[in-house]
A protein has these predicted regions:
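Midchain, well-structured core segments that form catalytic/ion-binding scaffolds
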Residues: 1-112, 139-140
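Active-site-adjacent substrate-binding region
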Residues: 25-32, 107-161
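Domain-wide signal for the mature, well-folded portions of proteins, strongly enriched
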Residues: 69, 82, 88-95, 119-124, ...
Length: 222
């Protein structure tokens, strides 16, 4: 929040856009300046809203976005701490005020349990054939299944739904997104195959659950 003013006299106003642009540049540069180059961190904005008239300096600005990472401790937590610090210091420097409207605790990354992943691969190669199994690149989208893996061992897999002839396979959150529903058959088969292998596995799964209360973990879900 800044101070309203006329475009002819910016010196008599306090434009929150000035504060925001500095903050945005700092957040964008945080990855290269402060995070291990072997750690992944992305930052993007989904919206910035401020003002309605070309000749009126607004008094408010709101913005929202996400930061994605594969290590909460090495990338996620440092980014959140820097965001809060930079927001406080920049608003003080520019004579503005700021309030965080919504920022839940960071969601954990999905890490498949090694034993479960090996068990699932063996089962799927046997039931579906090794030619149908791929190792995809790490995925940057947030996934609430990460919370389940904090309490129980498990594995997350993806089912192919692309079909160019049917026009299926566009990116998520786009108007063109659609799935080839025949892929759901293989997803069901994968789940059954893994469940049977897990239940018939004679080797105990070594796992230490996160001691954080379930109610607290649930608050991380965006």
């Amino acid at each position: 929040t800044g101070t309203f003013g006329h475009g002819a006299r910016p010196d008599l106003a306090n434009n929150p856009m000035d504060c925001f642009t500095t903050l945005y540049q700092q957040l964008s540069a945080f990855r290269t300046r402060s995070v291990d180059p072997f750690q992944c961190l992305t930052f993007s904005l989904g919206f910035v809203k401020s003002g309605e008239k070309y000749n009126v300096i607004p008094d408010k600005l709101t913005f929202g976005g996400t930061a994605r990472f594969f290590s909460y401790e090495k990338a996620g937590r440092p980014f959140v701490e820097f965001l809060k610090k930079a927001l406080e210091q920049n608003t003080a420097l520019y004579g503005c005020k700021a309030k965080i409207l919504q920022m839940p605790e960071a969601l954990f990354e999905v890490n498949n349990h090694p034993q479960c992943a090996a068990l699932g691969r063996t089962a799927l190669e046997h039931d579906l054939g090794p030619q149908h199994i791929q190792d995809p690149q790490p995925w940057m989208a947030s996934e609430s299944y990460a919370l389940y893996l904090q309490k129980f061992p498990g594995v997350l897999t993806f089912t192919g739904i692309a079909n160019k002839e049917e026009g299926c396979g566009a990116n998520h959150h786009t108007p063109e997104f659609d799935i080839d529903e025949r892929g759901l058959i293989y997803g069901t088969a994968m789940a059954i195959s893994y469940a049977l292998a897990f239940l018939n596995n004679p080797q105990p799964i070594k796992f230490t659950p996160n001691p954080e209360p379930v109610e607290q973990l649930a608050k991380r879900n965006v």
